[in-house]
Regions:
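Blade-level signature of beta-propeller repeat domains, shared across WD40, Kelch, NHL, RCC1
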Residues: 244-276
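Start-of-domain marker
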Residues: 29-90
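Structural motif
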Residues: 59-63, 100-104, 143-147, 186-190, ...
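Short loop/turn segments that connect beta-strands within beta-propeller blades
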Residues: 66-68, 106-110, 149-152, 190-194, ...
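Bacterial Sec-dependent N-terminal signal peptides
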Residues: 1-32, 310-311
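Repeated scaffold domains used in trafficking and secretory/extracellular systems
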Residues: 38-45, 79-86, 121-129, 165-173, ...
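A short beta-strand motif characteristic of beta-propeller blades
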Residues: 29-37, 69-75, 111-117, 153-162, ...
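Short beta-strand elements that form the blades of beta-propeller/WD-repeat-like
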Residues: 43-46, 50-56, 90-96, 133-139, ...
Length: 311
């Protein structure tokens, strides 16, 4: 029985080793990207064509690259701008609370249109472009959420909003629901600002929407919001500096290198984590077997000594 158990444990360890090797190799794809370009990056965005957008807080620059690191466009700002999740690479949206301005730029990061909110509104804390016609504005002074058509410069709707503006870092409005993100809290409201959901989230940065799915991009974690189950962690790497995803892949900057993970890679990583869990359980089983073997040996030794004494 003992030999059978040892053989079984050995075969299990071999199979786990093969899982480790396969998953480790398949789940790591380093993109050929200049590490100097990644070193001082504060945030990273990706589109569904595999292009990368790097925002540097040091000089307020926003640069677009293809997946091989070739520069496709660059913007230099004099004040901080917040980049809205990139749904359409032909029209990228940026908002500056300092400048009270929203900008739309094309695939080469050339200006398409600028919206100046200073003339028409008191103070806009945050803005979210729903499409190429209307935006949602959080007016801090009026404590209202405004639906504004910038094509004909008219306010379509105005909703009271008396929640705190101080720690707000991102806003998203979709299908009559308002998604509010602070650095450590996620909230969902209806347009009457009745709270529908609330959950803590660490080091949150921004929202991303993929069709009907609302995602939260945090420092090194990505969550998916499920109205029935709450927040579900779909990507996590404690060692990552920055993470992001498009519809097909996950991206991360780690050790000033750029990594790409396909959906298949994520499945392999889950297998790897499960294998690690099984490895720990096996190690405990081996330790238990060795302990039992040692105890059995001690008992046999005592019995031999008793026999030697003539009992």
């Amino acid at each position: 029985l003992e030999r059978y158990l040892c053989k079984k444990v050995f075969l299990k360890l071999i199979s786990l080793f093969l899982v480790f090797v396969f998953c480790s190799v398949s789940a790591q794809k380093v993109l050929p990207f200049d590490t100097l370009k990644l070193k001082e990056t504060k945030d990273m965005f990706t589109d569904d064509y595999g292009n990368l957008y790097l925002y540097r807080n040091k000089d307020f620059s926003f640069t677009k690259y293809d997946s091989l690191g070739k520069q496709l466009g660059k913007l230099m700002f004099t004040v901080p701008f917040k980049v809205q999740e990139i749904q359409n690479p032909l029209s990228v949206t940026l908002f500056s609370e300092n400048a009270q301005e929203m900008r739309f730029v094309d695939q080469n990061l050339n200006d398409i249109q600028r919206l100046d909110f200073k003339q028409k509104f008191s103070f806009i804390k945050h803005a979210y472009a729903e499409d190429l016609q209307q935006v949602w504005l959080l007016d801090e002074s009026m404590k209202r959420l405004l639906q504004y058509n910038f094509r004909n410069e008219t306010t379509i709707n105005s909703f009271p909003f008396d929640a705190s503006f101080d720690d707000l870092i991102d806003l998203l409005v979709f299908e009559n629901k308002v998604y509010i993100l602070s650095k450590d809290q996620f909230r969902v409201y209806n347009l009457k600002f009745e709270k529908l959901f609330e959950a803590p989230v660490e080091n949150a940065k921004r929202f991303r929407r993929e069709n009907e799915v609302i995602l939260i991009i945090a420092k090194n974690t990505i969550f998916k919001y499920n109205p029935e189950k709450g927040l579900i962690k779909i990507f996590d790497d404690p060692d990552a500096q920055i993470v992001d995803k498009n519809s097909l892949s996950y991206f991360e900057i780690k050790g000033n290198k750029l990594y790409l993970y396909t959906l298949e890679d994520i499945a392999d990583i889950k297998k790897l984590k499960e294998a690690e869990k099984q490895k720990i359980e096996l190690q405990r089983s081996i330790e238990k077997l060795e302990k039992e073997k040692s105890e059995k040996s001690d008992i046999l030794k005592v019995m031999d000594e008793i026999q030697d004494l003539g009992f």
